[in-house]
A protein has these predicted regions:
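Short His-centered aromatic/hydrophobic patch
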Residues: 11-17, 35
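A conserved mid-protein helix/loop that constitutes part of the nucleotide-sugar donor-binding site
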Residues: 117-140, 157-160, 205
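A short helix/loop element that forms part of the nucleotide-sugar donor recognition site in Leloir-type
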Residues: 96-112, 258
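A short, active-site helix/loop in glycosyltransferases that binds the activated sugar's phosphate group
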Residues: 59-85, 89-97
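Aromatic "clamp/platform" in nucleotide-sugar-dependent glycosyltransferases that forms part
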Residues: 180, 199
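Nucleotide-sugar donor phosphate/pyrophosphate-binding loop at the beta->alpha transition
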Residues: 30, 39-60
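Short hydrophobic beta-strand element within catalytic cores of glycosyltransferases
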Residues: 216-219, 229
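Conserved acidic donor-binding segment of nucleotide-sugar-dependent glycosyltransferases
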Residues: 231-243, 251-257
Length: 290
């Protein structure tokens, strides 16, 4: 670190936070660690994790940052660990609303009909993300809207399970398993509804990006997702039951007034709280003051 003239070590991997804080301390430079999610410890390791946090902060002078209200509260209330809250961010030059002409042009490019009702999820396939819940309700959704399509972006440990479930339910031709995509906005702007069914999040960056594209969001009411409605109604928060997805989608399709309000509130909120230039400046100040 001294040889390369490093001024700050910013660590994101939880298993490295104490080690990197020690390295920074020995090198006489500043260190920052970012908590990205609402972690919980097993009873046997709880006190150890509290000690790691306390010693890194008080003995090694590491500054702790959290990315959302839920993560901040989790650290403060569960681990008795005060942190500096600086929200995550998105780039508004990469994620922005589409007009009708662009939406239809991209739908044509992707082979999606003008009158299709498109739902989308974006994220790695895992037990935490619970994409199974979305697939399970497709038969019920198709009873009301036969031209429905589910754009499934992401892959991971449960991808094959999800494909097997789709075949079992006979809805595989209504799902496009797109895997990981670089041009996520292209898929967001052709969608009518964004879904996130996680057990928990730190803060969902893909939800921020969807709201920035003015796509209405239906979210499970869990830590890291309920943050989006902390100030006002910016999404539809629903209980953690797949059947609630059907009710929420029907509500958005039949109540245009509430849908437009959610879109407006969500867009204004992410531009205010998760705007890249503003939050990056806060990170830079943290580096200078750490």
């Amino acid at each position: 670190m001294k040889k390369e003239g490093i001024d700050v070590i910013h660590t994101h991997a939880s298993n490295m936070k104490w080690d990197m804080a020690l390295v920074a301390c020995l090198a006489g430079i500043r260190s920052v660690y970012t908590f990205h999610s609402c972690f919980k410890s097993r009873p046997i390791s709880f006190l150890y994790h509290i000690w790691l946090r306390w010693s890194a902060k008080n003995l090694l002078s590491c500054k702790f940052q959290t990315i959302s209200d839920s993560v901040y509260d989790n650290e403060r209330l569960y681990y008795h660990n005060d942190t500096i809250k600086i929200y995550n961010w998105f780039g508004n030059k990469r994620f922005f609303p589409a007009d009708k002409a662009e939406k239809q042009a991209v739908r044509k490019e992707l082979g999606i009909s003008k009158d299709s009702f498109v739902i989308i999820s974006v994220g790695g396939c895992s037990v935490n993300k619970r994409h199974h819940d979305i697939i399970k309700v497709l038969p019920d959704l198709l009873k009301e809207k036969n031209n429905l399509m589910y754009l499934h972006l992401g892959q991971g440990d449960t991808t094959e399970e999800e494909k097997t479930l789709a075949r079992k339910l006979g809805v595989e031709n209504k799902i496009r398993f797109m895997g990981n995509q670089k041009e996520v906005r292209k898929f967001l702007i052709v969608s009518d509804v964004y879904l996130m069914t996680s057990h928990y999040e730190g803060i969902s960056l893909t939800t921020i990006e969807a709201l920035a594209c003015k796509i209405p969001a239906i979210l499970y009411d869990v830590p890291g997702l309920r943050d989006f409605n902390k100030e006002q109604l910016c999404s539809l928060l629903i209980p953690e039951q797949s059947t609630e997805i059907v009710k929420a989608i029907k509500k958005l399709r039949t109540n245009s007034g509430e849908k437009e309000m959610i879109i407006k509130n969500g867009y204004e909120m992410v531009m205010r709280k998760f705007f890249l230039p503003t939050n990056v400046r806060q990170i830079f100040k943290l580096y200078q003051g750490s």
